[in-house]
């Protein structure tokens, strides 16, 4: 099994657990904010993915959103249920995501949306696919006022320096904004050409790595600003510079 195939198998294993238990999520608790939650299903789905990875790649490390962690020269990054709040409320817009990193960045990734029966995968230098069909990102619009851009903003992140001002500029400049509740799926949709761009501050590793590789392997750009806060930005080629300039404007 290749790394790309293992990422897909692990993401599908997590998604199956979540799909089977929708409506029976068990205990739910808050993390950073009342609407930033974790359920028993999140943990069960993460276990399903991690157990498969540990069995197939016993020397690799892993990092799961819900606490699973082991060091290794390579690290599997797991978000077994991205979009938990959507999931708990019976909404679409959730997925399972697994990516593999080495010292040079992401090597392979998979994002599984069982509701739409879509599996996005990518490998470094080998392109991105959705259900086996190659993804080739179109150039997209050149200006923000023509663009469909996704974002998300948890309550604690609204307090970060400059964030509110940056969002005011986004509201003023972007043609249409979307907040679906699953950043990973939104990144997959950028890779598929369904969205023109994605921008979010202070993004966790498991919310960024799986989708970012999809975007770059489909022909887009996905980069972190490295500023404070650290904005993550992904977009079609022609839009990237315009979108990435928004957080730093005065």
Locations of regions flagged by a protein language model:
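Generic detector of well-ordered alpha-helical packing
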Residues: 43, 47, 66, 80-83, ...
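An extended, acidic
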Residues: 137-250
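N-terminal subdomain of lithium-sensitive/metallo-dependent phosphomonoesterases centered on the IMPase/IPPase/PAP
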Residues: 1-81
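A structural micro-motif at secondary-structure boundaries
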Residues: 130-134
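Residue-level signal for inorganic ion chemistry
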Residues: 18-21, 42, 53, 84, ...
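Small-residue (primarily alanine) positions within well-ordered alpha-helices
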Residues: 7, 11-14, 109, 211, ...
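DPxDG-like acidic metal-binding loop motif
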Residues: 72-129
